[in-house]
UniProtKB/Swiss-Prot annotation:
Function statement: This major soluble protein in olfactory sensilla of male moths might serve to solubilize the extremely hydrophobic pheromone molecules and to transport pheromone through the aqueous lymph to receptors located on olfactory cilia.
A GO biological process held by the record: response to pheromone
The protein, known as: Pheromone-binding protein
GO molecular function, one term: pheromone binding
Family from the record: Belongs to the PBP/GOBP family.
Keywords from the UniProt entry: Pheromone response, Pheromone-binding, Transport
Tissue specificity of this protein: Antenna.
C-alpha cells in the first residue's frame, strides 16, 4: 500500500540522516547514491 511505502521511505531518510551525521558525509555523496 502507498502508506507502507511512505513510512518506509521516511524511515530510510531518517536512517540516511543519521549515517550522514555519524560519518560526516557531504551531501554530494548522498546525491551520487540517488542518481
Amino acid at each position: 500500500s502507498p502508506e507502507v511505502m511512505k513510512s518506509l521511505s521516511e524511515n530510510f531518510c531518517k536512517a540516511m540522516d543519521q549515517c550522514k551525521q555519524e560519518l560526516n558525509l557531504p551531501d554530494e555523496v548522498i546525491k551520487d547514491l540517488y542518481n
